[in-house]
């Protein structure tokens, strides 16, 4: 079986990670002790992707939990599914990273990283044929961002041909913990551009807006935001966990979704949007699901796809529905909005259907878009970064851990390059793409 090793780093990463395990354990009929009480063979068909089968028929998540302080791990351990994890897979320090990327990446995190890699190695060795890794973390703090990206580069060194996938929570002033979030996020993106194959950008700004506008929650809590994240993560991984044809493993998803190696930042979306503990009173139709799914209000990144163009799209429908109707509606959506899809990648929208809906819903749809509009998110962080960096505000916290200002400048320009690359492909047309090539060759020859 093609296995995935899951890592979660830092407070945010551990909270959304453990929520993810609660949701998928429930979907696969696995209780908090790791025993199976399901009702469908489909639940066990590809259970090995995320779970090890231990003695006594218990299923144990193939998960590694990492943090630089014990607090969050203690609450995961005492949480609803805390006992399902392998006790040896909790790796934590005592010092904390104090929301400082440099501590996570260069000092405190670097001291803990080898003991994490030992656990990762052990999990990888227990795999029949490892397809890759997924990391849940945030980009705004110290551990998830600094140590998370350190782990990615170390794992990349050791497993260069395996897929590296991240669920990265992007900071926003609307839900802010720390003033240095733009620094931490920019330094992280600098790493993610080079070292991951696919990154799902989960944007706190968008989550907050969904809770506030759509779900009418006046003061959204992290619990409310995480409910949306777990629904999205469950949807995105559906094809990996249940039998199916399309995007059935991380590599196939990457091949369909990533036309250029650096442009691997996806906007996830979900429909229908429900609040925690909320009830769906009427079942949606396929046309409604499709329409909602492409609506910017349902996107988990605060970008409006109408301000850019889609390079590629993957859609996952869940529940019992007619394949024919799904295909018709998806074609319809593309034809009606053809100007929002680049014409130089034909058939750039792929659709999968899975029979098992998420709990509490008859039907649901998950959206994964690789859109040039994601540049709005990077621009937002870049502006906040520049505002502080030109005054060198708070820099001493980073240089004190041995960092050089040069690294900040490099990270800043790498992110600006990324924005220009997205813009370049947004403006490209089918005809002129060929002309660029020729001009380039001509200049080289001159």
From Swiss-Prot:
It comes from the Eukaryota. SUPFAM superfamilies: Tubulin C-terminal domain-like, Tubulin nucleotide-binding domain-like. Residues 426-446 are annotated as: Disordered. One of its GO terms (cellular component) is microtubule. Its cofactor is Mg(2+). A motif (MREI motif) lies at residues 1-4. Some glutamate residues at the C-terminus are polyglycylated, resulting in polyglycine chains on the gamma-carboxyl group. Glycylation is mainly limited to tubulin incorporated into axonemes (cilia and flagella) whereas glutamylation is prevalent in neuronal cells, centrioles, axonemes, and the mitotic spindle. Both modifications can coexist on the same protein on adjacent residues, and lowering polyglycylation levels increases polyglutamylation, and reciprocally. The precise function of polyglycylation is still unclear. InterPro entries: Beta-tubulin_BS, Beta_tubulin, Tub_FtsZ_C, Tubulin, Tubulin/FtsZ-like_C, Tubulin/FtsZ_2-layer-sand-dom, Tubulin/FtsZ_GTPase_sf, Tubulin_C. GTP binds at residues 11, 69, 138, 142-144, 204, 226. Residues 429-446 have a biased composition (Acidic residues). Its main location: cytoplasm. It is found in: Cytoplasm, Cytoskeleton. Keywords: Cytoplasm, Cytoskeleton, GTP-binding, Isopeptide bond, Magnesium, Metal-binding, Microtubule, Nucleotide-binding. Brain. GO terms for molecular function: GTP binding; GTPase activity; metal ion binding; structural constituent of cytoskeleton. The modification 5-glutamyl polyglutamate is found at residue 438. GO terms for biological process: microtubule-based process. Mg(2+) binds at residue 69. Belongs to the tubulin family. Dimer of alpha and beta chains. A typical microtubule is a hollow water-filled tube with an outer diameter of 25 nm and an inner diameter of 15 nM. Alpha-beta heterodimers associate head-to-tail to form protofilaments running lengthwise along the microtubule wall with the beta-tubulin subunit facing the microtubule plus end conferring a structural polarity. Microtubules usually have 13 protofilaments but different protofilament numbers can be found in some organisms and specialized cells. Tubulin is the major constituent of microtubules, a cylinder consisting of laterally associated linear protofilaments composed of alpha- and beta-tubulin heterodimers. Microtubules grow by the addition of GTP-tubulin dimers to the microtubule end, where a stabilizing cap forms. Below the cap, tubulin dimers are in GDP-bound state, owing to GTPase activity of alpha-tubulin. The MREI motif is common among all beta-tubulin isoforms and may be critical for tubulin autoregulation. PANTHER family: TUBULIN. This is Tubulin beta-1 chain. It comes from Notothenia neglecta (Yellowbelly rockcod). The lineage of its organism: Eukaryota, Metazoa, Chordata, Craniata, Vertebrata.
């Amino acid at each position: 079986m093609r296995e995935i090793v899951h890592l979660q780093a830092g407070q945010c990463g551990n909270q959304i990670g453990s929520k993810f395990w609660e949701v998928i354990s429930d979907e696969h009929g696995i209780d908090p002790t790791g025993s199976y009480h399901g009702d469908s063979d489909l639940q066990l068909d590809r259970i090995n992707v995320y779970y090890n089968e231990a003695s006594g028929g218990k299923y144990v998540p193939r998960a590694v939990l990492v943090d630089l302080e014990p607090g969050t791990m203690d609450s995961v351990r005492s949480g609803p599914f805390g006992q399902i994890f392998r006790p040896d897979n909790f790796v934590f320090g005592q010092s904390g990273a104090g929301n400082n990327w440099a501590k996570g990446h260069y000092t405190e995190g670097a001291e803990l990283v080898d003991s994490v890699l030992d656990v990762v190695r052990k999990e990888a060795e227990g795999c029949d044929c490892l397809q890759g890794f997924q990391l849940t973390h945030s980009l705004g703090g110290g551990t998830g961002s600094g140590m998370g990206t350190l782990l990615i580069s170390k794992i990349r060194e050791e497993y260069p041909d395996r897929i590296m996938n991240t669920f990265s929570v992007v900071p926003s002033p609307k839900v802010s913990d720390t003033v240095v979030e733009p620094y931490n996020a920019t330094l992280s993106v600098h790493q993610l551009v080079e070292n991951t194959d696919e990154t799902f950008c989960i944007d706190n700004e968008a989550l907050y807006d969904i809770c506030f506008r759509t779900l009418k929650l006046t003061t959204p809590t992290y619990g409310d935001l995480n409910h949306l994240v777990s629904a999205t993560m469950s949807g995105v991984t559906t094809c990996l966990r249940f039998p199916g044809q399309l995007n059935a493993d991380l590599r196939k998803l990457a091949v369909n979704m990533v036309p250029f190696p650096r442009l691997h930042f996806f906007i996830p979306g979900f429909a229908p949007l429900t609040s925690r503990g909320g009830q769906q009173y009427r079942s949606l139709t396929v046309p409604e699901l499709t329409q909602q799914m492409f609506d910017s209000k349902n996107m988990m990144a605060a970008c409006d796809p109408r301000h850019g163009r889609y390079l590629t799209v993957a859609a996952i429908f869940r529940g019992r529905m007619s394949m024919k109707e799904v295909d018709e509606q998806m074609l319809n959506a593309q034809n009606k909005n053809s100007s929002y899809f680049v014409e130089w990648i034909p058939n750039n929208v792929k659709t999968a259907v899975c029979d098992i809906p998420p709990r509490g819903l008859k039907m649901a749809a998950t959206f994964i878009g690789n859109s040039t509009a994601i540049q709005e998110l990077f621009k937002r962080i870049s502006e906040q970064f520049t505002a502080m960096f030109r005054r060198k505000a708070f820099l001493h916290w980073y240089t004190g851990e041995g960092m050089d200002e040069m690294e900040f400048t490099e990270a800043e320009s790498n992110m600006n390059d990324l924005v220009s690359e997205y813009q370049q492909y947004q403006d490209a047309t089918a005809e002129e793409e060929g002309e660029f090539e020729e001009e380039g060759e001509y200049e080289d020859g001159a």
